[in-house]
Amino acid sequence: MSAFTPASEVLLRHSDDFEQSRILFAGDLQDDLPARLDTATSRAHTQQFHHWQVLSRQMGDNARFSLVATADDVADCDTLIYYWPKNKPEAQFQLMNLLSLLPVGTDIFVVGENRSGVRSAEQMLADYAPLNKVDSARRCGLYFGRLEKQPVFDANKFWGEYSVDGLTVKTLPGVFSRDGLDVGSQLLLSTLTPHTKGKVLDVGCGAGVLSVAFARHSPKIRLTLCDVSAPAVEASRATLATNGVEGEVFASNVFSEVKGRFDMIISNPPFHDGMQTSLDAAQTLIRGAVRHLNSGGELRIVANAFLPYPDVLDETFGFHEVIAQTGRFKVYRAIMTRQAKKG
């Protein structure tokens, strides 16, 4: 996170305006501008664990990671700089949360790429902080307003759910496949063998659907789930609880917080981080899996067929198999053998 995003470059055009401000940065924080911009004070709140990791190294306790921001997270701030995400319900959750805590009179800046739909911020905040566009550059828009009325925020109203083969999946804004089971996960599930035993790690667990579906026909597996997203962690916990499935769920940047080894690692790894395409997480998953698999253990992932994972799998494990495929997706399997690099 050294190079600035287009949204941050637009903000830097106005850097003089922020020197005396006590700023809260929030939203899709893809770089470390919150730690580097010259301000009176800077705080940051993010729902993304990997963004918090970067910012906390420079900002310490002034960078916070959680699903819901608290009054302590926004204390003494007189300005909000909000980076618009690609997901509108996610923006609504975060902005209603933050504006319910910030005092009336707070300066509100919203910045984002045009393709992310940032212009819809005007309508979303019309009743609370009417916005005007103050800059347009780098295919981004920058909007400014002042908080006139605090919204009432209730996180419980943002929960959703759907059913998959008799299982109830709990979801929140910002969670992958929020409105239903995606085709890739469906293909991966079709390959899982009933009556599997052992320790299973679900990396990038989303709403937890892979784990609960696996546990239904393999009740003796011991589940661990992790994700970078605070909404995903909470959704997975709720999905497990609703379906009576036990498992440990926590935030982790791929393997950063994972301890121990497993008999199987499953994943539908992301290849987007916000608006940006990124293969980093999946490549880290493949290369790091050898440090978290028991001998004979298995990595099983689903991915878009066009993504360049076979080479990384072969380089790391010595070989791989394609055990299911459609026109769009492939399910890859790699086994932990003596051929595998030990990382």
UniProtKB/Swiss-Prot annotation:
Q: Which residues cross the membrane?
A: none
The reply on keyword S-adenosyl-L-methionine is: yes
Q: What is its EC number?
A: 2.1.1.172
Q: Which UniProt keywords apply?
A: Cytoplasm, Methyltransferase, rRNA processing, S-adenosyl-L-methionine, Transferase
Q: Where in the cell is it found?
A: Cytoplasm
Principal subcellular localisation of the protein: cytoplasm
Write out the catalysed reaction. Answer: guanosine(1207) in 16S rRNA + S-adenosyl-L-methionine = N(2)-methylguanosine(1207) in 16S rRNA + S-adenosyl-L-homocysteine + H(+)
Q: Does the keyword Transmembrane apply?
A: no
Question: What family is reported?
Answer: Belongs to the methyltransferase superfamily. RsmC family.
HAMAP family registered for this protein in UniProt = 16SrRNA_methyltr_C
Q: What do we know about how this protein assembles, alone or with others?
A: Monomer.
Q: What PANTHER family does this protein's entry cite? A: RIBOSOMAL RNA SMALL SUBUNIT METHYLTRANSFERASE C
**Briefly, what is this protein's role?**
Specifically methylates the guanine in position 1207 of 16S rRNA in the 30S particle.
Name of the protein described by the UniProt record: Ribosomal RNA small subunit methyltransferase C
Which organism is this entry from?
Answer: Escherichia coli O6:K15:H31 (strain 536 / UPEC)
